[in-house]
Amino acid sequence: MKNEKIDMSRESDTFHVSQDGVYTITGTNSRHGITVSAGVRATIFLQDVNLCDLGDMGVAFHIAENCHITVILEGNNILHSGREMAAIQLRKQSVLNIKGN
């Protein structure tokens, strides 16, 4: 099980959650978001995150099929996607739980 901390302000591409585990994500990125690969079970802490993927089909937070994801919000978090897309996209047979203060 992976335990990783990611500063999105240092990422030059979309961050891919491809393994089960716990991820803590911080920072601002005006070009890239987060993608969770199919079948992943993870807890993702968003700590004062500001993510924008403003391409016409851009998605700030994409969760593929058959995932079980818990997102825990800490601080102020902003997710913004392109004009045609929701900020968080959840595919078939995935479960998303969102918790926060």
Regions found by a protein language model. Name each.
Residues M1-N101:
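A composition-driven surface/loop motif
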